[in-house]
Amino acid sequence: MLIVQKYGGTSMGSIERIHNVAQRVLESVTLGHQVVVVVSAMSGETDRLLEFGKNFSHNPNKREMDRIVSVGELVSSAALSMALERYGHRAISLSGKEAGILTSSHFQNAVIQSIDTKRITELLEKNYIVVIAGFQGADIQGETTTLGRGGSDLSAVALAGALKAHLCEIYTDVDGVYTTDPRIEEKAQKIAQISYDEMLELASMGAKVLLNRSVELAKKLSVKLVTRNSFNHSEGTLIVAEKDFKGERMETPIVSGIALDKNQARVSMEGVEDRPGIAAEIFGALAEYRINVDMIVQTIGRDGKTDLDFTIVKTQIEETKQALKPFLAQMDSIDYDENIAKVSIVGVGMKSHSGVASIAFKALAKDNINIMMISTSEIKISVLIDIKYAELAVRTLHAVYQLDQ
């Protein structure tokens, strides 16, 4: 059975930990599995390399920065390969390019286009453990590219799909996916299995175990995911399509988890000209700046004017200001509020149960938490609230949906 294992920066964070990873990999080999390993740079190394590159330019060339930051994964993959050989097993490290990962030419945020698995397959047939540098690939010209935040997870999922691996194991420093952040709610429970769609919502709403790009790709390629702790042998969380859940579930939980995202800002535009096409123009301008808009509320127009509120990622405020400059003359005022948080309730059971939203709203009202904005999907309800109530809201909702049981 072929397994792809990915180890993150914390798991690879020291010489001792790299030896620990080698032992974990060899445990799988002992069970009779073929193993392809994808590794991140050692903890803190990517940030160190980024800062190093910035010493030479206030506006660093993206191509050159990709060449610098990609070194971190090359070092960790070579180190793990040597550790595996020390313990008596044939191993070889490959860069993203050597592993056949072809990407677009968007330096620092490239997209994987295809993977030529020939070399990896040949090495596996020769009984090698193949250790691949995550987070990177090469474009059609052979230029080194990096995949952006969470790129090593993306590398692992893409490789698992291309190799038709039985399983893709993502090793981190937590035991799996929890009903909410255990640092906020100590009664949070580990989830044994969760659907791609639920995980995608939790990831996009701020859950840190997996990023949504990786979950999206896993769903697209039907890659079975497991998130595990590299420092113990807990079962972790299985992430699959609903139809592939293991065992019989008496009833799908209405709510699977509560996610908190504090990296949000609210943009409030008052007195905007109320005419056909104004919203299309505003959001079109934001799209040109690649600004990701989430929650949107527009009031009913009166006296030829309307109010428009929406949320963005906090780090994109300056780009948003630039994008909206041409519209300032067409509104009375604009305000940016960073003191907000988004709390999301996620669960596939919402599709077949009514009243989920009212339970949340009543519970928040009881704690005097005011809701500023609301957005919903088939399996998610998100509310925007004052950031000072963020953690209280998480605990309240976790309790009201009995996720601690």
Swiss-Prot record:
GO terms for molecular function: aspartate kinase activity; ATP binding. It comes from Helicobacter pylori (strain ATCC 700392 / 26695) (Campylobacter pylori). This is Aspartokinase. It comes from the Bacteria. GO terms for cellular component: cytosol. CDD domains: AAK_AKii-LysC-BS, ACT_AK-LysC-DapG-like_2, ACT_AKii-LysC-BS-like_1. The gene is lysC. SUPFAM superfamilies: ACT-like, Carbamate kinase-like. Residues 267-344, 345-405 form the ACT domain. Keywords: Amino-acid biosynthesis, ATP-binding, Diaminopimelate biosynthesis, Kinase, Lysine biosynthesis, Nucleotide-binding, Repeat, Transferase. Pathway: Amino-acid biosynthesis; L-lysine biosynthesis via DAP pathway; (S)-tetrahydrodipicolinate from L-aspartate: step 1/4; Amino-acid biosynthesis; L-methionine biosynthesis via de novo pathway; L-homoserine from L-aspartate: step 1/3; Amino-acid biosynthesis; L-threonine biosynthesis; L-threonine from L-aspartate: step 1/5. Its EC number is 2.7.2.4.
